[in-house]
């Protein structure tokens, strides 16, 4: 567990406060996240705390996250329970996922194709829901896919809507915002051409490679170099050591032309996904053996860094 600094110490609450912060889990693009407790029920929760001395752009991004999460009703997306201001801090109370992120497990080399197929299936189910609601996540990556365990079983939740956006009819279902994390960005996002939900599909393909190999393509390069290479180079491919079905799934996700890139609903019918097994039987052992790494930067909602310097490729989500 990371050590709390004075800057990240939660505001002191009265003795009758409903929620209490316990240990620091990680730091995301807009705030710190703690393991906490709902004292009215004894339920463990995640509490994201955002300092309010921030720019209007940053505060608007956080408010967008709250607004979007409050509307989402999907079993494959993290649930938000409450939000309020404490002193000069905004507290966002949400579901605690105790099984670690898929980035944690991928970096430890624990994932085989059976694990990956189940994870991708549930990510696609989340995207089907979000895209039907005219939402684009725009930062799909393994650090934002969390494993959970509860009395009903084990599964995954797609997290971190800090940069997600609702598409508006007035914008012809297209946006020109430059957001996301460089290694997972689609060519059209980097070029800042109009794009839609298909940007999430490209990121899903990159994440599939990350799950298999422990890191995304170009992980050894500086993020600015990656932003130059992705639009110019051929799409990344999996090595022949993986099954043909898995390689074809990745290739379809990484179709360069977004108009020809399949939808999340279409990808759910892909052979690699159709043959995925039971989430409970396949993911439960993973979640049970999870132990946070000392230098792990991806606990709950950790997309940027912890108190330890992150590996180069864990580049903070760009905001502009």
Locate predicted features.
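Conserved short submotifs of the Hanks-type protein kinase catalytic core
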Residues: 87-101, 105
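Conserved N-lobe beta3->alphaC-helix segment of eukaryotic protein kinase catalytic domains
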Residues: 44, 49-73
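C-terminal regulatory tails of eukaryotic serine/threonine kinases
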Residues: 258-259, 265-320
């Amino acid at each position: 567990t990371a050590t709390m600094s004075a800057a990240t110490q939660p505001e002191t609450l009265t003795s009758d406060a409903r929620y209490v912060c316990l240990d620091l889990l990680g730091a995301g693009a807009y705030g710190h996240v703690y393991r906490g407790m709902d004292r009215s029920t004894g339920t463990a929760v995640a509490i994201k705390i955002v300092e309010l001395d921030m720019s209007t752009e940053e505060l608007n991004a956080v408010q967008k996250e709250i607004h979007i999460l409050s509307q989402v009703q999907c079993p494959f997306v993290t649930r938000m329970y409450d939000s309020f201001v404490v002193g000069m801090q905004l507290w966002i109370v949400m579901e605690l996922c105790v099984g670690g992120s898929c980035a944690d497990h991928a970096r430890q080399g624990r994932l085989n194709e059976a694990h990956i197929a189940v994870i991708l299936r549930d990510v696609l189910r989340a995207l089907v829901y979000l895209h039907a609601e005219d939402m684009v996540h725009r930062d799909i990556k393994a650090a934002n896919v969390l494993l959970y365990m509860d009395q009903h079983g084990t599964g995954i939740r797609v997290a971190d809507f800090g940069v997600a956006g609702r598409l508006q009819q007035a914008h012809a279902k297209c946006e020109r915002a430059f957001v996301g994390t460089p290694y997972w960005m689609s060519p059209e996002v980097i070029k800042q051409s109009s794009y839609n939900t298909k940007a999430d599909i490209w990121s899903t393909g990159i994440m599939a490679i990350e799950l298999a190999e422990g890191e995304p393509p170009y992980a050894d390069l500086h993020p600015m170099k990656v932003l130059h290479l992705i639009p110019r180079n051929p799409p990344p491919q999996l090595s022949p050591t993986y099954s043909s079905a898995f390689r074809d799934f990745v290739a379809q996700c990484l179709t360069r032309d977004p108009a020809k890139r399949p939808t999340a609903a279409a990808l759910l019918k892909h052979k690699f996904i159709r043959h995925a097994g039971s989430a409970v039987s396949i993911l439960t052992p993973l979640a049970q053996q999870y132990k946070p790494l000392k230098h792990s930067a991806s606990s709950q909602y950790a997309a940027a860094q912890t108190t330890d310097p992150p590996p180069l490729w864990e580049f903070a989500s760009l905001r502009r």
